[in-house]
Every structure is written in structure tokens, then in C-alpha cells.
């Protein structure tokens, strides 16, 4: 398993993953898969398709690539419709079910780029960023039910505070949750502007943008059940990867790091993962191994 912890910019903001034009850590992550021309590979975060195109460029006629994305927007980025490539519009938590559906028992490698793409952050209609006054949606899959507005309107104060603390790592989580519950008694919070107005007084002085980004991160993770999906996908990958197969994961925050590390340790204990050491570029935390 090759896990690469992304470095941050001068403001401490993670470099955005999976932009629809320039994939993050393209060479490092695909090199980590040690592509076999006739192998079977999975890209569970297709996004703009950059990582998938690089994998396909290294596959021969006998190779296969399955690429997952639950967002319908990603389908616009498909450029290869040949027999080697299969696009699966689904959450990657269902990886094992889909591989069974396609008759695939084992894979040679899997790549996961866990960051939010600039496409989502720059789309003012999706509610992923506080830069726009837009509906509090935050669903990666627009066909799914619960939105961020639903969570803010229905969770009790304790549950909402737990979400903000666990997934946003904000010490002021209980004060923010109390303010949300108080505000929604007057009117529901339905736009990012509504949330900003309620939460801004509780942001740390000098860290307002960073704290607000963490608040939005917490809601996004809860809306999309990201931690559960990640655990399920990694467990499935451990079962699907053949001996010597590779898992290359790009993480962007400590929550993803902890899940990846925990899953890797569990796989080591079960005899599914053999740790290896590889050099990675300065500024990134190395965590490598092979199944």
C-alpha cells in the first residue's frame, strides 16, 4: 500500500486533488502501482480522468481498467471507450460487488485519490465551498437523499457537535452546534450564506478561513458517509488484490490518514499486506507496502 500525505500551500490549505486538468501526484501514484501491461487495475476516484488515462497509457491490449465515480459530471471526462476500459458510476464502497458483477476475482492494483476536486469546489451550485452563496447540498452523488441542509435541520445538538468535532476537528464544535440549533428555530439554514452567518462568530481569530473550511469538510464527510465508504473500499481492496498487487492511496487530511493506517495495520495482521519501504518526495509522508 502506498499512501501519500499531501503537502499544503503557504496558507496551510491542502493542494486540491483531482482537478479536471492537472491530476495530483500523477507520476508518483501510478508508478506506485508498478503497472503490468496485461494486468487488471481499478481507479476508484475517476474525477477528471487523469489518473485513469495514465494507467491506460501503460496497459497493453490485454490489460483492463475499471474506473469508479458516483458523480454524473465525471462521465463527461471519458475519452477512452475501448474494450480495456469500463466506467462504473457508483460509490467505491461497492467495489467488491461490481468486480463480482464483471467476473473479476482478483486485481493487480488500485488507485484512490481521496481529495475533493477543484471542479466541486468551483461549482457554486453544489455547496462545497463557502466562497459562493449557494444551496447547502454537498452531495457527491446528486441522486442520493440527504443534503448538508437536511443535516443542519434534523440532527440534535449533541449529534451535530460530534460531527463537527470528529470530521472537522474543531474545538468549538459544541458552540457552533448550539448556535445552529438556536438559529434554525427561527428559520432553516438552506444556503452557505446562512451557515456562514451563524458560524462566523465562533471561528478562531486569524484562522477564520481554515476553520470554516474544516466546518464544511465535516458536513461534506457526513453527507457522503466518506469514512464508512473508505473503510469498506480498503477492506474490499485487501481481499481483491492478488499477491504482489499494489494499492496507491493519496490522502489529504488526518482523518483519511488514520483510516488508511488502521486498515493497513489490520491487513498486515491478517497476512494480507507485506510492508515495503519506498522513497517518496520530500514533504510527503511515506507509507508503502504491497499486497
Question: Language model features by range: what are they?
Answer:
Residues 1-291:
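S-adenosyl-L-methionine-dependent methyltransferase catalytic core, i.e., the SAM/SAH-binding region
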Amino acid at each position: 500500500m502506498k499512501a501519500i500525505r499531501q503537502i499544503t500551500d503557504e496558507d496551510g490549505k491542502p493542494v486540491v486533488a483531482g482537478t479536471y486538468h492537472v491530476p495530483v501526484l500523477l507520476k508518483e501514484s501510478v508508478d506506485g502501482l508498478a503497472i503490468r501491461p496485461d494486468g487488471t487495475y481499478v481507479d476508484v476516484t475517476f474525477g477528471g480522468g487523469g489518473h485513469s488515462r495514465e494507467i491506460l497509457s501503460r496497459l497493453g491490449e490485454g490489460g483492463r481498467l475499471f474506473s469508479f465515480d458516483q458523480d454524473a459530471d465525471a462521465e463527461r471526462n471519458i475519452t477512452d471507450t475501448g474494450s480495456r476500459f469500463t466506467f462504473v458510476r457508483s460509490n467505491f464502497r461497492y467495489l467488491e460487488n461490481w468486480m463480482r458483477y464483471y467476473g473479476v476475482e482478483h486485481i493487480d492494483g488500485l488507485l484512490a485519490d481521496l481529495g475533493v476536486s477543484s471542479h466541486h469546489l468551483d461549482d457554486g451550485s453544489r455547496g462545497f465551498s463557502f466562497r459562493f452563496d449557494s444551496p447547502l447540498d454537498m452531495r457527491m452523488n446528486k441522486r442520493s437523499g440527504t443534503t448538508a441542509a437536511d443535516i443542519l435541520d434534523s440532527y440534535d445538538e449533541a449529534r451535530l457537535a460530534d460531527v463537527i468535532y470528529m470530521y472537522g476537528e474543531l474545538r468549538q464544535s459544541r458552540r457552533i452546534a448550539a448556535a445552529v440549533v438556536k438559529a434554525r428555530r427561527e428559520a432553516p439554514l438552506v444556503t452557505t450564506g446562512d451557515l456562514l452567518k451563524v458560524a462566523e462568530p465562533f471561528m478562531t481569530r486569524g484562522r477564520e478561513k481554515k476553520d470554516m473550511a474544516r466546518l464544511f469538510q465535516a458536513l461534506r464527510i457526513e453527507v457522503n458517509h466518506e469514512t464508512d465508504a473508505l473503510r469498506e473500499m480498503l477492506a474490499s481492496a485487501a481481499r481483491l488484490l492478488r499477491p504482489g498487487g499494489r494499492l496507491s492511496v493519496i490522502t489529504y487530511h488526518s482523518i483519511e490518514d488514520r483510516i488508511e493506517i488502521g486498515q493497513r495495520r489490520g491487513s498486515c495482521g491478517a497476512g494480507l499486506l507485506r510492508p515495503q519501504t519506498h522513497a517518496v518526495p520530500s514533504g510527503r509522508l511515506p507509507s508503502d507496502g504491497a499486497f
